[in-house]
Every structure is written in C-alpha cells, then in structure tokens.
A protein has these predicted regions:
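Alpha-helical structural elements
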Residues: 7, 17, 48-51, 95, ...
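Ligand-binding pocket segment of bilobal, Venus flytrap-like solute-binding proteins
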Residues: 1-13, 23
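Mature extracytoplasmic/periplasmic domains
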Residues: 16, 20, 25-91
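Residue-level detector of alpha-helix boundaries and kinks
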Residues: 9, 22, 92-96
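Conserved C-terminal helix/tail region of periplasmic/extracytoplasmic solute-binding proteins
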Residues: 84-117
Length: 117
C-alpha cells in the first residue's frame, strides 16, 4: 500500500516523455532577471528539491543523485518514483512531434469516430 493506504502506485512503463526549454527573446527588457530565473529554476539542487513534492523527473542528470524523500513522509524515497529512474525509463518513448504534426488531425478524426460508436 502507498502512503495514503491505497493499493495502487504510479507505473511509468511505456511512458512518453517530451523535452521542454526556456527561451529569452532577443532584445528582452528584463534579460538579466530572465537569466537569473533560468539559472535558479534549472539548478541541480532546485530540480532535486522539486522532486520531493511531485514525481516529475528532474531535467538534469546531476539532480538524480540528490533526490531525497517525500516532503511529508521521510520513509518514501522519491528517487524510486521518478519517471527518469533507471528502472522506470527502460521502455520510455520520446514524443515524436513531427509525427503528430503530420497525423494529429486524421488520428483525432478516427479516434472520435471510434468513440461515437
């Protein structure tokens, strides 16, 4: 059972992951503040700290070793619950944005037709 006494857990097998990024537009008025934010929000320690609240895999491999326990229960090792943990990432698929850009409309039509049956 999990921390709430429920008999279920997150399963990451077959997950689809995607990549994100931060952008500072050329000519930004607050460039220094934006750079400070990006440095803070992508820092190894910050990403590891975020993982104590929610099982989002940190964007930096350097954060993995620093992931601690769940913020309200020291008996739960959050590293085991990350989608990026070695045991959870073996069958992960990277989202193929080109495929979806080319096929989303057709597949959505087919899916909606199937749903309406």
């Amino acid at each position: 059972k999990n921390a709430e006494g429920q008999s279920f857990e997150m399963v990451w097998d077959g997950q689809i992951y995607d990549l994100d990024l931060w952008v500072i537009p050329k000519g930004s008025k607050n460039k220094e503040a934006a750079l400070d934010f990006v440095a803070f929000s992508t820092a190894t320690e910050q990403l590891a700290a975020q993982a104590s609240w929610i099982s989002y895999g940190p964007a930096r491999a350097s954060s993995e070793a620093r992931i601690g326990t769940f913020h309200s229960d020291d008996s739960i090792n959050m590293a085991d619950h990350m989608p990026t943990a070695a045991a959870n990432f073996g069958n992960a698929l990277q989202n193929d944005f080109e495929f979806w850009a080319d096929n989303a409309d057709q597949l959505n039509e087919r899916f909606n037709a199937w749903l309406s049956k």
